[in-house]
């Protein structure tokens, strides 16, 4: 699946992701750069709506739900990271790759 196809699928899936509490979604890594191999995973960065009142295990479960929703839509193994949990150095490293979806 090309980068443009992934972006289109994620935009189509946005209502379901928003229903799960996702307020922002971006992709990064090899799929965002366009140099992914067939076996590359899809790296996503998410923000959860603070009004969703998700904490602890409920938040971890939601992240898993988001990954499964994206995997079902794209057919690509997905790894979701919470934007607020990433280290500043990691944020700097992925900044050039980052493509905001919504």
Describe the predicted segments one by one.
Residues 30:
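P-loop (Walker A) phosphate-binding loop of NTP-binding proteins
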Residues 39, 43-44:
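A short, structured beta-strand/loop element
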Residues 45-49:
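Short hydrophobic/aromatic beta-strand micro-patches
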Residues 1-24, 33-34, 38, 51-102:
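Catalytic core of pol beta-like nucleotidyltransferases
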Residues 27:
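Conserved histidines in hydrophobic membrane contexts and catalytic metal-binding motifs
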């Amino acid at each position: 699946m090309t980068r443009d196809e992934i972006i289109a699928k994620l935009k189509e899936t946005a209502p379901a992701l928003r229903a799960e509490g996702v307020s922002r979604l971006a992709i990064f890594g090899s799929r965002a750069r366009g140099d992914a191999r067939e076996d590359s995973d899809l790296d996503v960065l998410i923000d959860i709506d603070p009004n969703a009142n998700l904490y602890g295990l409920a938040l971890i479960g939601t992240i898993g739900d988001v990954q499964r929703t994206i995997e079902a839509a794209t057919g690509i193994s997905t790894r979701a990271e919470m934007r607020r949990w990433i280290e500043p150095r990691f944020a700097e490293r992925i900044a050039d790759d980052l493509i905001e979806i919504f």
